């Protein structure tokens, strides 16, 4: 328990420090590092399912996307995604031993981790960007904490017993309320130009994205026959285990914030 707590404290302090003081390039560097570590674990799991992704190519793309986003914004991210698809097609055509499943796994891994996480960098570039990235991270933590506290005490109705037996609908509702509370604070304090109704909607959508990311990774691990994505974080498993809920949150929060008037 002490090891788990210490690991969580170090991870949290590094994350908060970079978000608040690291500016856009600092956040891009952290996202790239987390993405590469998570990508290594993702590709290792898929290899257990008899797939052969191009890990070197995939990890280079995951590392490059946050920096392309930091320098050129959305155009940089879309350009990096386009380059990824074109390079994957060339790789598939030139090497006859490469199967469609290998190419698809490589492209999906980069899109799932590198492209999605890079939206945190886009968030950082908005007005009140540091606060919005912090809200995205804290909303995931709030979702986890509220879902655990309620689910472990009064949770009776299983949400996805075949994928994540400990998740309950009661915990899901509590986690959603915790996430919504975070975005109400954003509406009340940050100058992001949101209405209360839009902030509530973002909170609900972010909660769904957080749980979806968690369940997807749980399904991925079950298919690969592993309990944890890795062993590098004592008491927490791997890096993908730590950021699975955050991966889709940045995407959902960014586009809903833009639609709600943030700039």
What does each model-found stretch correspond to?
Residues 147-148, 152, 218-226:
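Juxtamembrane interface at the ends
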Residues 255-263:
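Juxtamembrane boundary at the C-terminal end of a transmembrane helix
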Residues 1-208:
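Membrane-embedded alpha-helical bundles of polytopic integral membrane proteins
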Residues 143-146, 173, 240-250:
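Membrane-embedded alpha-helical segments of transport systems
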Residues 12, 179-180, 242-245, 249, ...:
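Hydrophobic transmembrane alpha-helices of multi-pass small-molecule transporters
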Residues 222-246:
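Interfacial loop-to-transmembrane junctions
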